[in-house]
Amino acid sequence: MNQIIDHIAVIGGGAWGTALAQTSRRAGRRVTLWAREPEVARAINATHENPDFLPGVSLDPGLHATADLAEALRGAEAVLVVCPAQALRPVLTTARPLWPGRAPMVICAKGVEQGSGARMSEVATAVLPEAPLAVLSGPTFAREVAEGRPTAVTLACADGALAEALVLALGTRTFRPYASTDVVGAEIGGAVKNVLAIACGVVEGLGLGDNARAALLTRGLAEITRLGRALGARSETLSGLSGLGDLILTATSMQSRNFSLGFALGQGRTLDQVLGERRSVAEGVHTASAVVALAARWAIEMPICAAIHGVLSGDYDVTSAIESLLSRPLRVEGGSESQIHPTAKTATP
């Protein structure tokens, strides 16, 4: 029999945290949302709207928000952690003494930690080893989830029974989690696609055409697959919702923070200019260097991610980055992807 999860805490009052709190209320759960900014919590409670991060979306009146982390966690039977990837370690360190017993943690952040190269589940296990762990990932825009538009995601947990219990707790008619036991696969797809989305945005901003973007998406999926398989992920996860599905969504829409950032770079704007106009985080900016370092550690070729890391770090301009990709040797597709060497021509008599 699956355990029953009724009381959910959501750590993170941004767009995605608010959307997950809203869909959890639709699933009939008691929900407390923690927002770092007291004014965000006050606005949600007073107006049933998050005007800073999800303006115009009406929230369930039963959704309670607080800026007091202890209050948010008290009595929770599951905790959704919805903070930027690079903030996960400090957020969990603060939450650790307040954690509600052995309540499972569902990580909803997508990225790789800078410096350590750790996946989000590895960070969580290091800080809170006693908390059962799951990962929620997939093709999602926060506003559409909050508005109740049809969405499907992967919910991965090494404990299959817990994965199913969380699916039952969070699932609704329009929010469809699919249970998986492949945590690594769910994480790698969700992290790397943010870097690839920046690349696709650059291609769009430069006006290189649909052919180029399709090629970049396909070769980007090959990079996700190479890294994921090296780390132990299953191929079907990488070609599923949290891999290919998330890549298609994030790398083809201006709703994506990462795609729109890449588009602006392709149009000639600087990274500082683009980031200076934003309040929300484009995770690919921080994940690029960590993914490239992780790939180097495992001797995995990821030329698209490396090119975008070069752009973000100031080593290349966008035109040079694209040129570096186009000048790579021709290869066999699939398998070992061995390089094709030209055969020297011999003169005919």
Curated annotation (Swiss-Prot):
Q: Which GO terms describe its cellular component?
A: cytosol
Catalytic residues identified in the record: 193
Q: Which residues bind NADPH?
A: 16, 36, 110, 142, 257, 281, 283
Provide this UniProt record's keywords sorted from A to Z.
Cytoplasm, Lipid biosynthesis, Lipid metabolism, NAD, NADP, Nucleotide-binding, Oxidoreductase, Phospholipid biosynthesis, Phospholipid metabolism
Read off the Pfam families from this record: NAD_Gly3P_dh_C (PF07479), NAD_Gly3P_dh_N (PF01210)
Ligand binding (sn-glycerol 3-phosphate): 110, 138, 140, 193, 246, 256-258
Q: Where in the cell is it found?
A: Cytoplasm
Q: In which pathway does it act?
A: Membrane lipid metabolism; glycerophospholipid metabolism
Q: Does the keyword Transferase apply?
A: no
Output the PROSITE patterns linked to this UniProt entry. Answer: NAD_G3PDH
- Listed GO MF terms: glycerol-3-phosphate dehydrogenase [NAD(P)+] activity; NAD binding
EC number(s) per UniProt?
A: 1.1.1.94
- The enzyme's main class, written as a single word, is oxidoreductase
> Biological process GO terms, please?
carbohydrate metabolic process; glycerol-3-phosphate biosynthetic process; glycerol-3-phosphate catabolic process; glycerophospholipid metabolic process; phospholipid biosynthetic process
Alphabetical list of SUPFAM superfamilies matching this protein: 6-phosphogluconate dehydrogenase C-terminal domain-like, NAD(P)-binding Rossmann-fold domains
List the catalytic activities from the record: sn-glycerol 3-phosphate + NAD(+) = dihydroxyacetone phosphate + NADH + H(+); sn-glycerol 3-phosphate + NADP(+) = dihydroxyacetone phosphate + NADPH + H(+)
Q: Where is the signal peptide?
A: none
State the similarity comment.
Belongs to the NAD-dependent glycerol-3-phosphate dehydrogenase family.
Q: What does this protein do?
A: Catalyzes the reduction of the glycolytic intermediate dihydroxyacetone phosphate (DHAP) to sn-glycerol 3-phosphate (G3P), the key precursor for phospholipid synthesis.
Instruction: Indicate what this protein is called per its UniProt record.
Output: Glycerol-3-phosphate dehydrogenase [NAD(P)+]
Q: Which organism is it from?
A: Rhodospirillum rubrum (strain ATCC 11170 / ATH 1.1.1 / DSM 467 / LMG 4362 / NCIMB 8255 / S1)
